[in-house]
């Protein structure tokens, strides 16, 4: 059998692509080295932020607004346990923060619902938060967080119900191109398709070593909290920048545990076995202490944590482009630790590619040619 589309990597983007392409009537094969959702990539740990006024650059805003529409649609499949939780997101940092300036600019350009607060206003609304006098907060009322593993599980199930073929726990060992399409090799056999999407995350270089993607080991952890920090008490998800430039992110507490991670830093790695479990690097459990001590002093000790990986591009912007010399293969990689919120729209873009549809978005900023 020759498929219309083979998906290499069925985590965040691949799961979405499998669903949207199958729903469009294509004959699709999803593949993954493990059984998604799993602990080997960048999507585990239950939750991921979704922010609309984007500190990483205005070019992302059209993508994230479409992503939000798709997340809302997907959430209707899990109304008892919604995939998207509209908790709001407070972005905290010094008044001269470049990240916050980008958030404000995005909000202004796209007329997003963002409220600016000074330090006293932040602490009055959320007494659990402490910030210096020179801090501001930009509160995104319509943003919140996503249940990442539930989303992937839902997409995979919906794709399967729609007739998508799925080959999991089976790594792709080689990819070949010819005039007739794309061929992949796996331990289970050889498969062919007219087109392929490579969204293999951190270990994409195992297949395509020429790509400019650097794996980085990252950690996040859950700390002792109480009901004051919960969604029921209107405590928001957050990003926070310390005076030294370190960037943190976190979520409202659930079951008396608040999850937080540090966006910058981490350990550069070159193979999967270098991503050692949480607590095997001495700084893992204390990485969030500077932020907690200064901004959330009521949070208690570290309860547990997890390690994941970022697939960083050189400029930490996404790579969305066809493989050089092979217009039948789309790369979606280099998501650099801020990609999950876009998984829905990136999956839709991949499905459009498989149908020879022109994307509705300007993807020029994400081309590989920018690194030449």
Curated annotation (Swiss-Prot):
<dbReference type="InterPro" id="IPR023493">
    <property type="entry name" value="Me_Trp_Oxase_MTOX"/>
</dbReference>
<keyword id="KW-0285">Flavoprotein</keyword>
<protein>
    <recommendedName>
        <fullName>N-methyl-L-tryptophan oxidase</fullName>
        <ecNumber>1.5.3.-</ecNumber>
    </recommendedName>
</protein>
<comment type="function">
    <text>Catalyzes the oxidative demethylation of N-methyl-L-tryptophan.</text>
</comment>
<dbReference type="InterPro" id="IPR045170">
    <property type="entry name" value="MTOX"/>
</dbReference>
<dbReference type="GO" id="GO:0050131">
    <property type="term" value="F:N-methyl-L-amino-acid oxidase activity"/>
</dbReference>
<dbReference type="InterPro" id="IPR036188">
    <property type="entry name" value="FAD/NAD-bd_sf"/>
</dbReference>
<feature type="binding site">
    <location>
        <begin position="4"/>
        <end position="34"/>
    </location>
    <ligand>
        <name>FAD</name>
    </ligand>
</feature>
<keyword id="KW-0274">FAD</keyword>
<keyword id="KW-0560">Oxidoreductase</keyword>
<dbReference type="InterPro" id="IPR006076">
    <property type="entry name" value="FAD-dep_OxRdtase"/>
</dbReference>
<dbReference type="Pfam" id="PF01266">
    <property type="entry name" value="DAO"/>
</dbReference>
<dbReference type="GO" id="GO:0008115">
    <property type="term" value="F:sarcosine oxidase activity"/>
</dbReference>
<feature type="modified residue" description="S-8alpha-FAD cysteine">
    <location>
        <position position="308"/>
    </location>
</feature>
<dbReference type="GO" id="GO:0005829">
    <property type="term" value="C:cytosol"/>
</dbReference>
<dbReference type="GO" id="GO:0050660">
    <property type="term" value="F:flavin adenine dinucleotide binding"/>
</dbReference>
<comment type="similarity">
    <text>Belongs to the MSOX/MTOX family. MTOX subfamily.</text>
</comment>
<comment type="subunit">
    <text>Monomer.</text>
</comment>
């Amino acid at each position: 059998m020759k498929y219309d589309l083979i998906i290499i990597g069925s985590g965040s983007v691949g799961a979405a692509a499998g669903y949207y392409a199958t729903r469009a009537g294509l004959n699709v094969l999803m593949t993954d080295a493990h059984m998604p959702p799993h602990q080997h990539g960048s999507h585990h740990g239950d939750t991921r932020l979704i922010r609309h006024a984007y500190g990483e650059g205005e070019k992302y805003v059209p993508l994230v607004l479409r992503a939000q529409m798709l997340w809302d649609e997907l959430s209707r499949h899990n109304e008892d346990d919604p995939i998207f939780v509209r908790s709001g997101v407070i972005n905290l940092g010094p008044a001269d923060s470049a990240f916050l300036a980008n958030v404000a600019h995005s909000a202004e350009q796209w007329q997003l619902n963002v409220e600016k607060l000074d330090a006293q206003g932040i602490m009055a609304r959320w007494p659990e938060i402490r910030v210096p006098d020179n801090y501001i907060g930009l509160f995104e009322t319509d943003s919140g967080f996503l249940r990442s593993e539930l989303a992937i599980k839902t997409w995979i199930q919906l794709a399967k119900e729609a007739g998508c073929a799925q080959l999991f726990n089976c790594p792709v060992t080689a990819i070949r191109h010819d005039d007739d399409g794309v061929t992949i090799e796996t331990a289970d056999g050889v498969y062919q398709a007219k087109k392929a999407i490579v969204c293999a995350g951190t270990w994409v270089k195992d297949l395509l070593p020429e790509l400019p993607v650097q794996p980085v080991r990252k950690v996040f952890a859950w700390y002792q909290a109480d009901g004051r920090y919960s969604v029921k008490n209107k405590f928001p998800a957050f990003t926070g920048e310390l005076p030294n430039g370190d960037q943190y992110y976190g979520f409202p507490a659930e079951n008396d545990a608040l999850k937080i991670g540090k966006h910058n830093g981490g350990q550069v790695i070159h193979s999967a076995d270098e991503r050692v479990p949480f607590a095997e690097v001495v700084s893992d459990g204390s990485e969030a202490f500077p932020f907690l001590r200064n901004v959330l002093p009521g949070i208690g000790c570290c309860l547990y944590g997890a390690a994941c990986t970022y697939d960083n591009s050189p400029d930490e912007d996404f790579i969305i482009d066809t493989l050089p010399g092979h217009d039948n293969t789309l790369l979606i990689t280099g998501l650099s630790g801020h990609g999950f919120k876009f998984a829905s729209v990136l999956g839709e873009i991949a499905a459009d590619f498989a149908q020879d549809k022109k994307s509705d978005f300007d993807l020029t900023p994400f081309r590989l040619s920018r690194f030449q």
